[in-house]
Amino acid sequence: MAAKEVKFHSDAREKMLRGVNILADAVKVTLGPKGRNVVIDKSFGAPRITKDGVTVAKEIELEDKFENMGAQMVREVASKTSDLAGDGTTTATVLAQAIVKEGAKAVASGMNPMDLKRGIDKAVEAIVQELKTNARKVTRNDEIAQVGTISANGDAEIGRFLAEAMQKVGNEGVITVEEAKTAETELEVVEGMQFDRGYLSPYFITNQDKMRVELEEPYVLIHEKKLSNLQALLPVLEAVVQSSKPLLIIAEDVEGEALATLVVNKLRGGLKVAAVKAPGFGDRRKAMLEDIAILTGGTAISEDLGIKLENVTLEMLGRAKKVVIEKENTTIVDGAGSKDEIQGRVSQIKSQIEETTSDYDKEKLQERLAKLAGGVAVIRVGGSTEVEVKERKDRVDDAMHATRAAVEEGVLPGGGVALLRAAKALDSVQAENEDQKHGIEIVRRAIEAPVRQIAENAGAEGSIIVGKLREKPEFGWGWNAQTNAFGDLYNEGVIDPVKVVRTALQDAASVAGLLVTTEAMVAEKPKKEPAVPAMPAGGMDF
């Protein structure tokens, strides 16, 4: 086992604080509408330019092991905030730095670290409650656009695209961000349920120009096994022909004689039909077929339910307003399923998302949720160069998470003002002793840090801005760094989602509290590499 180096007390805290400061100082220059960019060198390709706090934090690795531990703890703050709220990573880093700085001073002066931490925790709880009390619900489209614009560093186009996407696919819908092949940014919305399986035979195509199958008001037959013989299906196929409606068959596979029979019937005009493979694999395939059944108001025919193909009736088939099948995907628009059943299925998937620990499963469940609840929107981000596209994509990602968070929990005045205003909640927090009281005061001072940093990045004096904000107690009144003017931030569209502000403070205080209560640090001793002997000169004999 390699030898370890151990540091104690103030020696450990100093090293750790130095690491915290290096990382936080690099991240905090990006805060606010006039925040600067950070250029990150890459081992391959062009350098990356970003204004996203968590991207900067993830790139920082320090040579000194003890300093690096401090930096990594704050990096964890940014990552956690990014995972939970998707934005607010720079605010979280600034808050963590402020709490650790003040906390380290207090411990050095002889205060009890555990009581300080208890005081910090009490203060954070009170502020979070105050933030929730003052939250405003977001309902209008222009408010969603404002949140997106603020998060995208004042880019109104991004805000507009996000508001439009959320309007089209709903709050549960999936919005994905991709890099465009052109210089323009564009939005594409797929309404209804889409899955990545196309037609099994080109003979099913009804629209030759667009090379796709279009079925108006079709019946939908959902079967979890392979279909190789249609004998058992004849009664239901005849009933579909009588109704003169088209039919979509979704099965594990349709092969051989069954596929040939369907194609011949389609070409002769007896039965408007198309067949596609079922989406997904294994258990997820079964779940997705049940989703389609609930969406279309049909029954997924499976042996588990004891339903045989020969017993299938028209009532067991699903219905939809329209189905469009392309070479590689199928879209079911406006399924005839009951709203209550769809809502019940949505709630079930939501609880599965909360319970799962796997990121992969969570992503797949969210995709299923979106397909049931609304649709999928794709924002393709354009730019003149690859570097510009990547930088813009970072901002769109931030903005997308911020708009989601805003719809979820509401909004507060932005620019760090909400935290400053919430400080009044600390007046009623009861401390058990002087050290706890000092912990509460640490948070009172720390929550000024975001406003000060935004002001400094905009070239203003942080203390003067904070002083002026204190003169007027109205919750929504604050300083707009973009215009360098005071006013009602709600009216000016300077707003932050409650979830982002709350998560930033909670995560920052959680990690900062751990750093303040650290008394010893252990790291591996750096190995002294033996010097490599010089190569002998060529052509010499030994």
Swiss-Prot record:
GO terms for molecular function: ATP binding; ATP-dependent protein folding chaperone; isomerase activity; unfolded protein binding. Disulfide bonds: none annotated. Belongs to the chaperonin (HSP60) family. Forms a cylinder of 14 subunits composed of two heptameric rings stacked back-to-back. Interacts with the co-chaperonin GroES. GO terms for biological process: protein refolding. NCBIfam families: GroEL, PRK00013.1, PRK12849.1, PRK12850.1, PRK12851.1. ATP binds at residues 30-33, 51, 87-91, 415, 496. HAMAP family: CH60 (MF_00600). It is an enzyme of class 5 (isomerase). The gene is groEL2. It catalyses: ATP + H2O + a folded polypeptide = ADP + phosphate + an unfolded polypeptide. One of its GO terms (cellular component) is cytoplasm. Keywords: ATP-binding, Chaperone, Cytoplasm, Isomerase, Nucleotide-binding. It is found in: Cytoplasm. It comes from the Bacteria. It comes from Mesorhizobium japonicum (strain LMG 29417 / CECT 9101 / MAFF 303099) (Mesorhizobium loti (strain MAFF 303099)). This is Chaperonin GroEL 2. Together with its co-chaperonin GroES, plays an essential role in assisting protein folding. The GroEL-GroES system forms a nano-cage that allows encapsulation of the non-native substrate proteins and provides a physical environment optimized to promote and accelerate protein folding. It holds the Pfam family Cpn60_TCP1.
